[in-house]
Regions:
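Short, acidic, small-residue-rich periplasmic hinge/interaction motif at the N-terminus
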Residues: 12-60, 90-92, 98
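Short acidic/polar hinge/loop motifs at secondary-structure boundaries
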Residues: 55, 101-129
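Extracytoplasmic beta-strand/coil segments of soluble accessory domains associated
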Residues: 64-104
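Face-selective signature of the C-terminal outer-membrane beta-barrel domain
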Residues: 218-233, 263-460, 541-544, 592
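Membrane-embedded beta-barrel scaffold of Gram-negative outer-membrane proteins
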Residues: 288-292, 489, 517-575, 697-702, ...
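C-terminal beta-signal and adjacent terminal beta-strands/loops
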Residues: 588-591, 641-651, 675-744
Length: 744
């Protein structure tokens, strides 16, 4: 446009006035234009920014740490990357990388054994997460979907990270006139810092290492070849020495002292490879064919003897023995032995397609999968209390020592011996239709789809068992043509989870081939309200949900180890509400507050409803980012989580109807302080910093309030009263970590 000119003239009659103005151009500064894609919101998918992963403090720095701050997602063990979603367990979550389903090791029983998550956060481009009500194109699990896309590099970049917990190197580049792109990452992790902060003195030598590669080659305008590979070697050498734990009340404190002998040596070797071909037939149709192989070889070997003394602590402040153990309530020992081996090979081939025409989209796919699992279990526990070997429960004999001698053989308190060979074949497919349009002036999205899954199980040369399920699913969303920016959505359907290896194996190690798929009839109502405060964007997301659960396979949880009854003898439900407010509480930095309310119960063998192991009634998560106003390169990050206690801590043999005690609430705050020397917004053309695309250094304070969290108990016996005491096994305390990041 041009600037306007206004000029007054005064003239006599018949005079001629010549005026030749030159208009000057004028630039009008428009307000910020925001282009929004509401498709993910309409699908109930939470999109997270990949760059946040690198800076959020957490014991496991990665995508899972970010997920724990979302409503409905919980984990009460900072050393584990596994998580529960809306009343589900760890095994009910789907994880995809570039459209390929990812599997985890099977034998891991504690968070400190896990090592690295499969997902290398430095290689991530996009993160999409759904806590329920997801579309038919995703697989057959009950709870959630985490859909990760790795980067396709555009130029050379090398990223190096190092801290007291380990380090990583990632290199990415393009070749062959940018037809070939490659990104390769190597990581190393050492959990010694966390394990040594516990109340158990140990000799601990963990070695968690993995290497990943993602290559993409554009053969032509229509054909692109991709390869995703992973190799992981986790070695866990653990030698406990002593333990001292005080617990109880102020007026009745107790102390447990344990002396250990023995060691544990575990090895988890996993390899994974996936080759895919994308074929862009035309502007409307895209086809993808993928071949995948996953192999895990796991060894869990340990012989650990423990001798303990449970004593009363003098709580009399005026006493000369104040704070000392004055009376022993229980003396005993136990020996734990394990020689467990597992070898699993999972291969599959699938074809997926997408057809788009105008505002219509059709997605379809078919998949065949073969699972071959060989498993050997040799695991037993002997408990001795004051010279008497404690026998297993409910063996139908009378032992009234010392009044009458008992001459029966010594038997382990727990004993599992099994050897299994398992072959599972699966055929699955899906078809779904999506459309965008209008109802009057209101924008709408809808999706309808169906999945089918057939599987056959052959265990230990027994007769093959065949089963088949169908899962219809649907979504509908509307964005009214209102002055306020609000989107409403509803989704639901039938979500079934066919049994995998762990669900088929009972407490005794026996494989039961006829276990049915667990089923959830799921309904989700949600809304997104986008608004502005302080001239900064905010969004309030609210969802309420209900799950009607049937064919439940009851389970118990010990740390991160899930043991199933291998019996579809329960029904249940899960209901709750999730609220998340995210926005720029500090200009230019997104933060959020999450609130989750949940209730989930189950009825086993019609004995009545009790809380499920994942019944976490309340969850609060806060992710806050800030910077120093006069020094904006100095940034602070706070990751705060509060989870109410869940039922747990019971002995492995306990009847859940007799043990509904809850563990203590999980409370944790991690603080990170980072200084950015240079990054994309602050580059140097000369000097030392000109060599870097990015250079950062910082400190992380984990569990900054040094709160004692516990997720399991050690059970010891009082010989005098025959009572058992649950001694909490505390997680990590306050830890300081130093880290540095470089990008070239």
């Amino acid at each position: 446009g041009f600037k306007s000119i206004s000029k007054e003239f005064f003239s006599n009659r018949r005079s001629i006035i010549r005026f030749s103005p030159i208009l000057k151009s004028e630039n009008e500064i428009l307000e910020e234009v925001v282009i929004k894609n509401d498709t993910k919101d309409a699908q109930g998918i939470t999109t997270l920014k990949a760059e946040k992963i690198e800076r959020i403090p957490g014991a496991n720095s990665g995508i899972e740490t970010l997920l724990m701050t979302l409503p409905g997602v919980s984990n009460n063990n900072e050393l584990s990357t596994q998580y529960n979603v809306r009343g589900g367990n760890f095994d009910e979550n789907l994880v995809y990388v570039n459209g390929i389903e990812i599997y985890r090791p099977f034998l891991v029983r504690s968070g400190q054994q896990e090592g690295l998550s499969f997902v290398n956060s430095t290689m991530v481009q996009n993160i999409n997460f759904s806590a329920g009500g997801f579309q038919a194109k995703y697989g057959d699990k009950l709870s959630s979907v985490l859909d990760i896309t790795y980067k396709k590099p555009l130029e050379f970049t090398a990223t190096i990270k190092a801290s007291l917990l380990g380090g990583s190197i990632t290199v990415e580049d393009v070749f062959l006139d940018k037809k070939l792109s490659a990104i390769i990452g190597v990581r190393y992790r050492d959990n010694s810092l966390f394990v040594n902060s516990k109340q158990i003195e140990t000799n601990f030598k963990p070695r968690f290492t993995d290497a990943q590669a993602f290559l993409s080659y554009k053969q032509s305008e229509k054909i692109t070849l991709n390869f995703l590979g992973n190799f992981s070697l986790n070695k866990y050498d653990y030698q406990p020495v002593t333990r001292r734990t005080r617990f109880g009340t102020v007026t009745d404190p107790l102390e447990l002292i344990v002396f250990y002998d023995g060691q544990e040596k575990d090895t988890y070797l996993t390899s994974f490879g996936a080759l895919s071909a994308d074929y862009q037939a035309n502007d409307d149709l895209k086809l993808t064919a993928t071949v995948t192989a996953f192999n895990t070889q796991e060894e869990e070997y340990f012989d650990i003897a423990a001798s303990y003394n449970l004593g009363e602590v003098d709580a009399n402040i005026g006493s000369q023995t104040f704070g000392d153990v004055t009376f022993s309530e229980g003396i005993g020992s136990q020996l734990n032995h394990s020689r467990n081996d597992l070898d699993a090979l999972i291969t599959n081939v699938q074809i997926r397609g997408t057809y788009k025409k105008d505002e219509n989209q059709i997605d379809f796919g078919i998949k065949y999968q073969s699972e071959n699992i060989k498993d050997r279990i040799r695991e037993w526990e002997i408990i001795d209390s004051v010279g008497f070997s404690i026998r297993p429960l409910n063996l139908g004999f009378i032992n009234d020592q010392p009044y009458n001698p008992f001459t029966g053989p010594i038997q382990p308190f727990q004993n599992i011996r099994a050897q299994n060979t398992l072959n599972i074949s699966r055929f699955s497919g899906f078809f779904q239709y999506s459309k965008k349009g209008f109802i009057g002036e209101h924008k709408v999205w809808w999706n309808i789809g169906i999945r089918g899954h057939h599987w056959s199980v052959e265990a230990n040369n027994n007769p093959i068992v065949h089963q088949f399920i169908v899962s219809p699913r649907a979504q509908f969303a509307m964005k009214p043509n209102w002055e306020k920016d609000i989107l409403f959505r509803i989704s639901g359907g039938v979500y079934s989870q066919p049994p995998f290896y762990k669900e088929l194996r009972d407490f005794e190690g026996k494989i039961l081939s006829n276990i049915k798929a667990q089923k959830s009839v799921h309904m989700v109502l949600g809304s997104d309200y986008s608004f502005t405060i302080w001239n900064r964007p905010f969004k309030l997301t609210t969802e309420v949900y209900y799950k009607n659960l049937s064919n439940i396979n009851p389970y118990s949880v010990d740390n991160v180890r899930i043991r199933y009854q291998a019996n579809n003898n329960a029904k249940g439900y899960a209901t709750g509400m999730d609220i998340r407010l995210n926005g720029e509480f500090v200009p230019g930095n997104e933060s959020w507050i999450s609130l989750g309310i949940l209730k989930t119960e189950e009825n086993i063998d019609n004995r009545g409803y009790i809380a499920r192991p994942s019944d976490q009634r309340f969850k609060l998560g806060i992710l806050f980012q800030d910077y120093v106003p006069n020094l904006p390169d100095l940034k602070a990050y706070l990751n705060l989580v509060y989870n109410s206690g869940v039922p747990g801590g019971a002995p492995s043999y306990a009847d859940p109807y007799n043990f509904q005690n809850r563990l203590r609430d999980y409370r944790r705050a991690d603080l990170g302080v980072l200084y950015v020397f240079t990054d994309a917004s602050k580059r140097f053309s000369t000097g030392f910093l000109s060599q870097f695309k990015e250079l950062t250094a910082g400190l992380e304070l984990f569990n900054m309030f040094d709160i004692q969290n516990s997720i399991t108990n050690t059970w010891v016996r009082d010989a005098a009263t025959k009572n058992q005491f649950g001694v909490p096994n505390y997680l990590s305390g306050r830890i300081l970590n130093l880290k540095i990041g470089m990008k070239f």
